[in-house]
Curated annotation (Swiss-Prot):
Quaternary organization: Homodimer.
pH-activity note: Optimum pH is 8.0.
Cofactor(s), by name: Mg(2+); Ca(2+)
UniProt enzyme class: transferase
Keywords, sorted A to Z: Host-virus interaction, Inhibition of host innate immune response by virus, Methyltransferase, Restriction-modification system evasion by virus, S-adenosyl-L-methionine, Transferase, Viral genome packaging, Viral immunoevasion, Viral release from host cell
GO terms, biological process: DNA restriction-modification system; methylation; mismatch repair; symbiont-mediated evasion of host restriction-modification system; symbiont-mediated suppression of host innate immune response
Catalytic reaction list: a 2'-deoxyadenosine in DNA + S-adenosyl-L-methionine = an N(6)-methyl-2'-deoxyadenosine in DNA + S-adenosyl-L-homocysteine + H(+)
Protein name: DNA N-6-adenine-methyltransferase
InterPro entries per record: Ade_MeTrfase_dom_2, C5_DNA_meth_AS, C5_MeTfrase, DNA_methylase_N6_adenine_CS, MeTrfase_D12, SAM-dependent_MTases_sf
Record's function text: Methyltransferase that methylates adenine residues in the ssDNA and dsDNA sequence 5'-AGACC-3'. Essential for genome packaging because methylation within the pac site makes the latter cleavable. May prevent degradation of viral DNA by the host restriction-modification antiviral defense system.
Domain SAM-dependent MTase C5-type intervals: 4-469
Enzyme Commission number(s) of this protein: 2.1.1.72
An annotated Gene Ontology molecular function: site-specific DNA-methyltransferase (adenine-specific) activity
Organism in which the protein naturally occurs: Escherichia phage P1
Length: 754
């Protein structure tokens, strides 16, 4: 499978690359403006361009100056949505960058569509505070990604001054603030979007770090919900106990001892006499990343401990132990002479970050790896120290020393620091040590980054989802229905091929993908049974209908049926046609109106004048047929279909080995007849016929197989013969004509290049 490439915005020190490169993904470019993270990128990834200001990327993508990646990842500045940043939201320029991200994602999708590449997959990370930002920043972001014009809201708003499950009344501002759920998904007109809060502590790092992750895409073969969500029965995380236990609270009231249920004879919910102590362990609350305060606040029994900024450090102090009658499981000798004990717990297995607890230490609980050991306290004056930068790197899952890079700024290095560095880098000179990055920028960059294991999990699920689609797109035998079960077209369409499908399928070869440069009514791809379909037409209204039916089937079918019921009169028809030509409809209503006009106009003719206006008159049909069955067949058709609107050349130039091209262009008029070749406001003269044939022969040389239909005009037969086509007869009955006597059997031709 071709490796996935990704573009990283607000890259920081590139948690995405550390997580995704081992999965076979490749960075296309970075975008970071902060000096120190940019220096880390330049040092660790010198071969990847750092494009700097992300607000300028959309124009560069559209101009083709930079690659349009398969995946777009971004961790927007979280300060605008965090408590520490006072939640400036969209009023803060950092929060407004989130909307620039939507602009960039749209530009990437537009550029990729020009090359018939699938839309990008979007990955976004931020703090949980974004879910309750007073300006509904998250709802704006979701709407932008999904393609809606108005912000989404989490639910119905209550009356002023009241709160409910979805909104919180803020008495200071006199406004409601949203309360978005911790996970959810939205299927919008442009993209599918899913979000979920993930906590790094369940992915193998020793910190609580809850973050909102959003995955979105316009791909029809990938559902973001399947990337972020898991079935409850197969989740790897056991839900933590958050309910306060009375017995546990009583036990730890004067320090840390034992809590929990009776799991093992050596650990009881009721404290054994030998483990009683007077404040033998102190609890420290995390005030900032790597900094702790001894304020005698036991974070472990706080309800807010579930939140992000309450990591806990515990150490043994000089508490006085005592003994009472009875024997304990951890006592070495009697009376008050026993050593104070500190319990340290280690995870049984941590992918990529496992460390042994100690050597020659008897495990207290497990028969496998030592997961809990007890240490004797020798020093009565133990103090909590600040975490070192390398420990912070480990907390995020980075390799040791990831941010320890040479800089151009000299710093003072004392003897202790030099000894510490030389312990890791024995050959490091004092001058080299002085030029290494200072701790301050390292702490900031690490704290602003993402947890590697969480990003790896998301990247792995994206690559597996895409890989499954790739595996499923291998060439398989087509599933062609018998003629009696062929599905009719949704539209009445001039030159439709439903009546000649048996003749066409006799010559249509096997292949991985069907390409139709002139899809029209769609009878061929609907019944041909290919695994993939690339379908083009110059008629923008036709393509809009197909895309809308793919995206909003229920809404479109319901709305179109209402048009059929309400407007089947001369006045109603003209009112719809007038609104259609004035471009007052959105995509959904325009699609419904297009189907209505096609089924109610004279002879089902789709025709536009030079001004681009639909100009066919009312057909005066008593009960026009509503194609519900045909639309359902479209939705249930074999394979994945991608619709594009434009010149036929683009999709033909995309063809290669394994592709089958079926071409049904506007027919060349027969001699002494008046052929109409301008149904969509685009002329199709004989010069266009020659250009089309030239493109088809080029595609055949690249490995594509070609079928083309046309009239039996002598100049067409000559053109096809001279270009190497095998020409076969195609007998068709004309179904659309202003003159009834011309709706007879036509002797058309099939040009074949296999």
């Amino acid at each position: 499978m071709k490796e996935l490439c990704y573009g990283s915005v607000c890259s920081g020190i590139e948690a995405a690359s550390i997580a995704w490169e081992p999965l076979g993904m490749r960075p296309a470019w970075f975008a970071e403006i902060e000096p120190f993270p940019s220096a880390v990128l330049a040092h660790r990834w010198p071969h990847v361009a750092n494009l700097g200001d992300m607000t300028k990327l959309a124009k560069k993508v559209l101009a083709g100056e930079i690659e349009s990646p398969d995946v777009l990842v971004w961790g927007t500045p979280c300060q605008a949505f965090s408590i520490a940043g006072l939640r400036g939201g969209l009023d803060d320029e950092r929060g407004a960058l989130t909307l620039k991200y939507v602009e960039l994602a749209n530009a990437i999708d537009d550029k990729r569509s020009e090359s018939f590449l699938k839309p990008t997959v979007i990955v976004w990370e931020n703090v949980p505070g974004v879910l309750s930002s007073a300006d509904n920043a998250f709802g704006c972001f979701l709407a932008g990604l999904a393609g809606e014009d108005a912000p989404f809201e989490p639910g119905d708003r209550p009356e002023s001054g009241k709160s409910n499950a979805f909104w919180r009344w803020d008495g200071k501002t006199g406004c409601h603030a949203p309360k978005w759920p911790q996970c959810g998904c939205i299927y919008g007109p442009q993209r599918k979007v899913a979000w979920r809060i993930l906590d790094a502590q369940y992915f193998g790092v020793a910190q609580r770090r809850r973050r909102v992750f959003v995955v979105a895409s316009a791909r029809t073969d990938l559902d973001p919900a399947t990337v972020l969500f898991e079935f409850e029965g197969v989740r790897r995380n056991i839900a933590p106990r958050r309910k306060k236990k009375e017995i546990a609270s009583a036990i730890i009231a004067n320090g840390a001892a034992i809590s929990g249920e009776s799991l093992n004879p050596c650990l009881h919910a009721d404290m054994p006499p030998s483990m009683k102590s007077t404040k033998a362990v102190n609890a420290f609350r995390m005030a900032a990343f790597g900094e702790y305060i001894d304020d005698e606040t036991a974070s472990t029994v706080k309800a807010r401990d579930f939140k992000d900024a309450t990591d806990l450090a515990v150490f043994s102090s000089t508490g006085a132990g005592f003994w009472s009658e009875g024997h304990g499981t951890l006592r070495a000798r009697e009376q008050e002479s026993h050593e104070h004990l500190v319990t340290l717990a280690f995870p049984e297995r941590m992918s990529g970050t496992q460390h042994a607890a100690t050597k020659n230490t008897s495990p207290s609980l497990m028969a496998k790896n030592p997961t809990a050991v007890c240490y004797e306290v020798r020093n009565a004056e133990v103090a909590v120290r600040r975490l070192t930068p390398v420990e912070c790197e480990r907390l995020q899952g980075f390799p040791d020393g990831h941010t320890l890079i040479p800089t151009e700024k000299r710093k003072k290095v004392n003897s202790d620091e030099l000894a510490y560095l030389r312990n890791h880098y024995p050959d490091l000179s004092e001058e080299e040590a002085a030029m290494l990055a200072a701790d301050g920028p390292r702490y900031k960059a690490i704290g602003n980054s993402m947890a590697i294991p969480v990003m790896r999990w998301i990247g792995d699920r994206i690559t597996k989802a895409v890989c499954r689609q790739k595996e499923g797109s291998e060439t398989k035998e087509r599933k062609v229905k018998p003629a009696a079960e062929f599905e009719r077209s949704i539209f009445k369409w001039a030159g439709g091929k439903f009546g000649v499908l048996e003749q066409i399928f006799r010559y249509l070869p096997e292949g991985k993908r069907l390409i139709e440069p002139f899809v029209g009514g769609g009878a061929v791809f609907t019944n041909a049974g290919y695994q993939e379909n690339l379908l083009n037409d110059v008629n923008a209204d036709l393509i809009n209908f197909y895309k809308t039916l793919q995206r909003e089937a229920h809404s479109l079918i319901t709305l179109a049926h209402r048009f059929f019921q309400d407007y089947n009169t001369q006045e109603g028809y003209l009112a719809v046609r007038n609104a259609f030509n004035k471009q007052v409809y959105d995509d959904l209503h325009r699609a419904a109106a297009f189907l209505f006009l096609n089924r109610h106009c004279f002879n089902g003719l789709t025709r536009y004048n030079q001004a681009g206006e639909f100009n066919v008159g009312y057909g005066k049909y008593k009960t026009p047929y509503f194609p519900l069955q045909e639309m359902e067949a479209f939705l249930g058709a074999e394979g994945r279909s991608e619709f594009v609107c434009g010149d036929f050349a683009a999709v033909i130039e995309a063809a290669g080995e394994g592709d089958v091209i079926f071409c049904d262009p506007p027919y060349e008029p027969l001699p002494n007849t008046e052929g109409f070749t301008n149904y969509s406001g685009h002329d199709f003269k004989f010069e266009e016929q020659k250009r089309l044939v030239s493109l088809l022969t080029d595609a055949h040389r690249r490995g594509a197989k070609v079928l083309i239909t046309n009239s039996g005009a002598p100049n067409i037969r000559e053109l096809y013969h001279d270009s190497g086509f095998r020409v076969e007869p195609l007998f068709a009955r004309r179904s659309v004509s202003c003159k009834g006597d011309t709706r007879g059997v036509a002797h058309d031709v099939l040009g074949i290049l296999l």
